[in-house]
Amino acid sequence: MDKWGLTLLSMVVGLGLLYFVSGDMIPSASAQSGQEEAGVVEINQAQFAELVYDYTQEGEWQFKGDKPVIVDFYAVWCGPCKRLHPRLEQLAREQKGEVIIYSIDAEKAAELSRRIGIRAFPTLLFIPVEGTPTLSEGLLSLKDLRQQADKIKGGH
């Protein structure tokens, strides 16, 4: 390979790595129905707009999913967020796809976080298929998470 080709290849690989590290190339959370065995699924703000709610459009809340959703807005430096994650993984295993659980690095998704009203970490967004979503700030116990999951599924 000549010097020009090697330089071009290096630039392409470097840009690809930069794109990946920036968080824009998170593995796709394609369809909610395919998330049943996945546990907590990391998404970015573009995926949130596609799968959950298009926050870029003005107007009333319009949920895009067909199953209840919990969205964990976290910060990588947040101790309570780190303690919450295993509880959410446990809840995802217990729910077996009845409730989809997404996780978003709120600092990388600053515009979304601002529009949703994230002011503290962790913040959970509980979204029923029909009705109004609710926000909960702070660390929740597994028992509280189960109760919230039951609520958004239409239970007690």
Question: How should each PLM-predicted stretch be described?
Answer:
Residues 80-95:
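Typically the conserved alpha-helix immediately C-terminal to a functionally engaged Cys/Sec
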Residues 76-83, 114, 123:
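C-type cytochrome heme c attachment motif
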